[in-house]
Amino acid sequence: MKKQLFSALIGASLLAPMAASAADYVIDREGAHASITFKVSHLGYSYVVGRFNDFSGDFSYDAAKPTAAKVNVTVNTLSVDSNHAERDKHIRSADFLNTSKFAQATFTSTTVEDKGNGDLVINGNLTLNGVTKPLAINAHAVGEGQDPWGGYRAGFTGTTTFAMKDFGIKMDLGPASSHVELDLVVEGVRK
């Protein structure tokens, strides 16, 4: 009887790591393995593209239970970079991001939908320009595993679109330029 109990305890302890809950990750900023880029139609003739150079965040993810995932990201809106200094100054102004008043944007997930094959919809709240609105991000789990330095990583891509006016951005560049497309690449290092 003691042997059976001991064997059961050893077996349970070996299986416990497999049944563990979601792992926590920090977005890899130091290695530059993450990006937040944007694209806005320029009057319907071309596109203005850019990125945010300074952001941080973390997420919790378990491939066996993707609907339990959680995401938190903070973006330094002062770090907007469209590769044109005068345009960046205008984007930071009260016409757009109003960074003197709202130097940060945040996204906090509320629910995650599993669409199968690594495809997810991450629902959450985006706070931008002092306005908080629901936002859905179409995401894909790219992969996860050990890195060459002894860490463990997980990576995702994502896209979303939102109307500038929904976040109190009143600058009217015409109907062709009313929405912002975001492309996200996220690689996290397990804590």
Swiss-Prot record:
It holds the Pfam family YceI. Transmembrane segments: none annotated. The keyword Signal applies. GO terms for cellular component: periplasmic space. Keywords: Periplasm, Signal. Residues 1-22 form the signal peptide. This is UPF0312 protein Sbal195_3198. It comes from Shewanella baltica (strain OS195).
